[in-house]
């Protein structure tokens, strides 16, 4: 999959999983448990590869999102990265996306940059979103 060879910064959306990864996984006749274990191992390996480019060599990884509730995935990440996985409260895991979007909305309302090229890989920082009165 070419995405993994692309330079940083880069980000994924749900379409990547649906269009790129699921067809590969579905092409094999292994059990669902084996496929899920393989996906968890792949995620942990890719995270470890990405961490090689991070200057901060802290001993912990702070996780959020749906994967934060997957204890097996967390164990595989710890094994691959040799770092402790820290999972915040369920409230933070469940609502961090809403908080981020709300914060981006406030920045947009103030006409301040709310999308950074260093995070998204865009050509420039920008102000995104629409305000309707």
Where would I find each of the regions flagged by the language model?
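Conserved ATP-utilizing enzyme core subdomain
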Residues: 1-44, 110-111, 120-133
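Buried hydrophobic packing segments
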Residues: 21, 47, 51, 101-105
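A short glycine/serine-rich beta->alpha loop
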Residues: 30-34, 86-93
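Hydrophobic, well-ordered secondary-structure elements that form the walls
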Residues: 43, 77, 98
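Phosphate/pyrophosphate-binding loops at sites that engage ATP/ADP/AMP, CoA/4′-phosphopantetheine
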Residues: 49-59
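Glycine-rich phosphate-binding loops at beta-strand->alpha-helix junctions
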Residues: 58-77
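Short, structured coil segments at secondary-structure junctions
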Residues: 80-81
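Glycine-rich phosphate-binding/hydrolytic loop that grips phosphoryl groups
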Residues: 89-133
């Amino acid at each position: 999959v070419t995405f993994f060879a692309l330079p940083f910064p880069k980000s994924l959306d749900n379409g990547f999983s649906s269009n790129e990864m699921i067809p590969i996984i579905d092409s094999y006749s292994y059990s669902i448990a084996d496929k899920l274990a393989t996906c968890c191992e792949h995620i942990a390996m890719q995270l470890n590869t990405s961490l090689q480019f991070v200057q901060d060599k802290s001993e912990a990884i702070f996780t959020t999102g749906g994967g934060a509730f997957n204890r097996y995935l967390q164990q595989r990440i710890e094994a691959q990265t040799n770092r402790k996985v820290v999972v915040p409260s369920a409230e933070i895991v469940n609502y961090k996306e809403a908080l981020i979007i709300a914060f981006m909305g406030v920045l947009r309302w103030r006409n301040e940059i709310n999308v950074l090229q260093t995070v998204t890989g865009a050509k420039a920082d920008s102000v995104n979103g629409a305000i309707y009165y």
